[in-house]
Each structure stands twice: as structure tokens, then as C-alpha cells.
């Protein structure tokens, strides 16, 4: 079949590809053979997982004892242990009792869904330009990844906290509630991050050290107004219907560079996490927020908490949308290293000190080198014409 002019555009959005009616995905979206064994339609895999009573389930943890002043110490202790175990064994959990109103989460989802329902040409008014250093805005993962292939997703990406640093001119003007709902969700997620970091700190060092992790993430080597708070970045992932989900991924397997990542979604399955040697499909747990442990927290915990390897699958039936808030330390002014109390003769430091930006740069460089080596291997040792710039972000 002759390609349409749309499919020949170098920067065609994945949504436009999906709406074009193509029956086979372009070759640049086909994953390598060694990745495809576990891929498939996300709905089919979710149904299979739901019917498999031996399949492990991502833990669901209620943290309401830390938001309820009338809770008992035993309840808080049990909560600390449940969060600690989930972060250590899984690196991911569903958080219930988080205190963010269901009405606000519904508003956030409605606003993001309305933005992506706009025609592609309208969304292009918010297009980013990673090549020019403008990462915030509407985009597609057009840069190649570890294997050199593209991912089946479009996205909207921007800073949400601190609010004073956010450029609201880059945020969608439509729908009208987008800015208000997103700002409110950002404020509340910042509070949730503090609560969860306190619980995770207690799981490492005891109930009198609940401030350890947040201090480590915000204690700076310089003192400017922008340097003493966590940064929260929002990425709305839009995974269009895919005619060949057994060949593609929405997001390839990766760990997040953040300290924590908070995830909402529209109820369509797609998230998988690696537990042991098995890919586990996340179930829909209404009212909860999914939380990932990221690289920064794994470093601070000296590996006691696990940065979870995960990926996003696609399907033929429905669009999947997810809202991910990445909670990160300031990029240049905080030195990440294992907490001193967790480094002993029997448990030496597993990570060398680095800033968040240095960690991100190392990770991008490693991915670029992996892609280059693979390209050269496939090209008989001369892979110069396969070189690509790394993606604007690894999450």
C-alpha cells in the first residue's frame, strides 16, 4: 500500500498515524525481536493476569494513618512497614488514603483528556522543540531510544511545582479548567510527596528520622530561592490505539530518574512492572495513586529501596492516557549519595556522589552508547549513519 503524505512527514504525531487507518505500524516503531516475546495487547494481558490467581499483585497501601490525627501509633507503625516492604520488594505501590480529593483527580483527568481531544493542528500550538532545548510542551518521542526505535505515544510535559517557577503561558488555555485543576493537583501532590518521603525515611531509620530523605533531596550546596524545594514535572502520556500492539510499546522498559513518581490514568490498562523475572500488569485500583520509587531514592537508600523497571503497553481497543508527576531534587545544587547511616563496613556505598543532572546525563550517555554499540553490531562494525541524539528525558 502506498504511504499517505501524512505518514511521510518526519514529525508525524503518533495520534495522526493511528487515525490514518493504517493496518501495519511503520518499521521505526517495531521493537527488536528480543523485546517482543512479552508484548501484546494490553487488554488481553490484563485479562489474562486477572484470571491468573497465582500472579503477584502490586501492593495496595493505605497511608491514611499519617493524615488522621486520631490514628494510633500501631496503625502508623504498620503503615511504615507496609510502605517500606513495597518500596524494597517492588519499588511500586498503589497508595490509598492519600488525601487528594477524588473530585480533583477527576478534574485533572477531564482537563487532560479534553486537551488531547483537540485536533492535532490545535495541539501543535503548544509544540516543544527538544533540539532547541525547549522540552516543555506538546511532543512525541521522536528521538530514538536504547534500541533505536520509536515509541507509540504523544505527550504534554511541563513543570507544575514550585508554582512560581512554572511558565503558565506554556500550559493549554483549553479547556478553561486545565490551569486551575493542574495547579491545585500540583500543590497537593507536593504535600503528598512530603508525607510519603517521611514514611519511607522512617522505614529506613526509625520513627524519629522522618525528615531524612526530604532533607537529603533539598539540602543544597548553594542557597538561592529556586534551590531549596523539590521540583514536580507533569507528563501526560497519550497512547493512541495501535493496530499491532504485539510489535510496539508506548514507553520502553526503563527506570525513572526521579525520587518518586505519582501516576493517575484513565482506567485503560498498559502499565507493567518487572517483579523478579516476571512482567506484572498493574490492576486498576479505583481511588488510588500509583507511586514508583525512582533512581534518586534508590541512591539515597543505598539500594534498600528499588527503582522499579517498568514499561507502557498499547492496545487495539482504546486510547490510554496517564498523568505522571515526577518528584525531583534541584538539578545542580543537591549532591545525591547514600545516607551516611546506611553505609557500613558490611554495606558499603553502592553509588558515587552525583548531582541529579549528572545522574541524568550519565544515564542518557549510557543509553546513547548502548544504541551506538547495537547499531554498529548490526552494521558490521560501522554504525556512523545510525547515530541519533538521546531523548529529552528518560522517564
UniProtKB/Swiss-Prot annotation:
<keyword id="KW-0847">Vitamin C</keyword>
<keyword id="KW-0560">Oxidoreductase</keyword>
<dbReference type="InterPro" id="IPR005123">
    <property type="entry name" value="Oxoglu/Fe-dep_dioxygenase_dom"/>
</dbReference>
<dbReference type="GO" id="GO:0009718">
    <property type="term" value="P:anthocyanin-containing compound biosynthetic process"/>
</dbReference>
<dbReference type="Pfam" id="PF03171">
    <property type="entry name" value="2OG-FeII_Oxy"/>
</dbReference>
<dbReference type="InterPro" id="IPR050231">
    <property type="entry name" value="Iron_ascorbate_oxido_reductase"/>
</dbReference>
<dbReference type="GO" id="GO:0016706">
    <property type="term" value="F:2-oxoglutarate-dependent dioxygenase activity"/>
</dbReference>
<dbReference type="GO" id="GO:0050589">
    <property type="term" value="F:leucocyanidin oxygenase activity"/>
</dbReference>
<feature type="compositionally biased region" description="Basic and acidic residues">
    <location>
        <begin position="382"/>
        <end position="395"/>
    </location>
</feature>
<dbReference type="GO" id="GO:0046872">
    <property type="term" value="F:metal ion binding"/>
</dbReference>
<dbReference type="GO" id="GO:0031418">
    <property type="term" value="F:L-ascorbic acid binding"/>
</dbReference>
<dbReference type="Pfam" id="PF14226">
    <property type="entry name" value="DIOX_N"/>
</dbReference>
<comment type="pathway">
    <text>Pigment biosynthesis; anthocyanin biosynthesis.</text>
</comment>
<keyword id="KW-0223">Dioxygenase</keyword>
<feature type="region of interest" description="Disordered">
    <location>
        <begin position="360"/>
        <end position="395"/>
    </location>
</feature>
<feature type="domain" description="Fe2OG dioxygenase">
    <location>
        <begin position="230"/>
        <end position="329"/>
    </location>
</feature>
<keyword id="KW-0284">Flavonoid biosynthesis</keyword>
<dbReference type="InterPro" id="IPR044861">
    <property type="entry name" value="IPNS-like_FE2OG_OXY"/>
</dbReference>
<comment type="function">
    <text>Oxidation of leucoanthocyanidins into anthocyanidins.</text>
</comment>
<feature type="binding site">
    <location>
        <position position="254"/>
    </location>
    <ligand>
        <name>Fe cation</name>
    </ligand>
</feature>
<comment type="similarity">
    <text>Belongs to the iron/ascorbate-dependent oxidoreductase family.</text>
</comment>
<keyword id="KW-0408">Iron</keyword>
<dbReference type="InterPro" id="IPR027443">
    <property type="entry name" value="IPNS-like_sf"/>
</dbReference>
<keyword id="KW-0479">Metal-binding</keyword>
<dbReference type="InterPro" id="IPR026992">
    <property type="entry name" value="DIOX_N"/>
</dbReference>
<feature type="binding site">
    <location>
        <position position="310"/>
    </location>
    <ligand>
        <name>Fe cation</name>
    </ligand>
</feature>
<protein>
    <recommendedName>
        <fullName>Leucoanthocyanidin dioxygenase</fullName>
        <ecNumber>1.14.20.4</ecNumber>
    </recommendedName>
</protein>
<feature type="binding site">
    <location>
        <position position="256"/>
    </location>
    <ligand>
        <name>Fe cation</name>
    </ligand>
</feature>
Amino acid at each position: 500500500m502506498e504511504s499517505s503524505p501524512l505518514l511521510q512527514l518526519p514529525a508525524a504525531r503518533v495520534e495522526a498515524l493511528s487515525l490514518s487507518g493504517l493496518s501495519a505500524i511503520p518499521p521505526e516503531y517495531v521493537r527488536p525481536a528480543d523485546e517482543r516475546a512479552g508484548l501484546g495487547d494490553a487488554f488481553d494481558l490484563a485479562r489474562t493476569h486477572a484470571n491468573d490467581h497465582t500472579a503477584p499483585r502490586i501492593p495496595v497501601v493505605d497511608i491514611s494513618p499519617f493524615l488522621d490525627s486520631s490514628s494510633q501509633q500501631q496503625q502508623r507503625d504498620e503503615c511504615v512497614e507496609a510502605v517500606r516492604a513495597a518500596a524494597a520488594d517492588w519499588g511500586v505501590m498503589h497508595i490509598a488514603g492519600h488525601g487528594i480529593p477524588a473530585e480533583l483527580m477527576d478534574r485533572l483527568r477531564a482537563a487532560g483528556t479534553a486537551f488531547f481531544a483537540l485536533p492535532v493542528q490545535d495541539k501543535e500550538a503548544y509544540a516543544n522543540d527538544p533540539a532547541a532545548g525547549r522540552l516543555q510542551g506538546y511532543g512525541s518521542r521522536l528521538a530514538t531510544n536504547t534500541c533505536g526505535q520509536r515509541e507509540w505515544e504523544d505527550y504534554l510535559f511541563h513543570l507544575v511545582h514550585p508554582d512560581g517557577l512554572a511558565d503558565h503561558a506554556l500550559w493549554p488555555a483549553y479547556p478553561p479548567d486545565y490551569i486551575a485543576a493542574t495547579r491545585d493537583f500540583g500543590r497537593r501532590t507536593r504535600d503528598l510527596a512530603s508525607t510519603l518521603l517521611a514514611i519511607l525515611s522512617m522505614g529506613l531509620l526509625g520513627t524519629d528520622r522522618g525528615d531524612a530523605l526530604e532533607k537529603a533531596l533539598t539540602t543544597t550546596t548553594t542557597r538561592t530561592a529556586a534551590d531549596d524545594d523539590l521540583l514536580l514535572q507533569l507528563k501526560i502520556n497519550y497512547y493512541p490505539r495501535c493496530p499491532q500492539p504485539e510489535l510496539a510499546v508506548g514507553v520502553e522498559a526503563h527506570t525513572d530518574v526521579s525520587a518518586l513518581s505519582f501516576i493517575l490514568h484513565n482506567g485503560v490498562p498498559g502499565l507493567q512492572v518487572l517483579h523478579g523475572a516476571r512482567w506484572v500488569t498493574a490492576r486498576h485500583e479505583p481511588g488510588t495513586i500509583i507511586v514508583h520509587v525512582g533512581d534518586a531514592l534508590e541512591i539515597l537508600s543505598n539500594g534498600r529501596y528499588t527503582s522499579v523497571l517498568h514499561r507502557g503497553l498499547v492496545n487495539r481497543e482504546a486510547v490510554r492516557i496517564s498523568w505522571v508527576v515526577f518528584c525531583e531534587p534541584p538539578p545542580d545544587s543537591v549532591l545525591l549519595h547514600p545516607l551516611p547511616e546506611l553505609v557500613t563496613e558490611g554495606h558499603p556505598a553502592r553509588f558515587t556522589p552525583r548531582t541529579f543532572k549528572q545522574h541524568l546525563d550519565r544515564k542518557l550517555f549510557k543509553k546513547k552508547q548502548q544504541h551506538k554499540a547495537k547499531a554498529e553490531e548490526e552494521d558490521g562494525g560501522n554504525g556512523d549513519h545510525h547515530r541519533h541524539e538521546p531523548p529529552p528525558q528518560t522517564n
